[in-house]
Amino acid sequence: MAAVKENRLRVLIPQEELEKRVAELAAQIDRDYQGRDLICIGVLKGSVFFMVDLLKRLTVPIAVDFFQASSYGSGGAVRGEVRIRKDTDLPIHGRDVLLIEDIVDTGHTLRTILELLRFRGPRSVRLCALLDKASAREVEVPIDYRGFEIENLFVVGYGLDYDERYRNLPYIGSIEPTKA
C-alpha cells in the first residue's frame, strides 16, 4: 500500500460559523418559498454535508433529489468538459428548483447543470452555494443564496475533498499539498 502524503491544512471557516450561516440561509429560503412546490437538488458528492444541514433547518415542504457531474480529474486538476454521472430522478417541470452546491469556482460545471435543468421547464431555478470562489470565475453563474465568498484557495472539509480525503472535517480548511 502506498504511503499517504500529508498536506498542510489551515482552518478558514470554523464549524460554528458554518452552522450559523447555514441557519441564516435556511431562514431566507423558508421566507422565499412559503406556499411553493420546492424540489431541492444536491450536486454530488461535495454538497451532501451542506445540503443535509440546510434541509434539516427548512420548514417548507420539500422533495429531494441529486445530480452528479464532474469536470475534475485526479488531484483536483480541472478538465475542460463537463460529464453527467447521475441525472435527477424526479420530474421538475412546473416546479420550483433549488440547486444546492458546495462551491462555485470557474462556473463551467454549474452553468451546464443550470442550462440542463432550465431546459426541462421548471417554474424557477435558483442556486444555493455554500462557497463562492468569485476570483476563479470564468463564466457568469448567478448565485441566489451564498454562504461565504472565499479566496482562490484549494479548500476541503464539510463535504469538499482532496482525492476523496478530508470530506468529513467539520470545518472548511485550505490545503496546500506537499511535494512528493
Where do the model's predicted regions map?
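PRPP-associated nucleotide enzymes
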Residues: 1-180
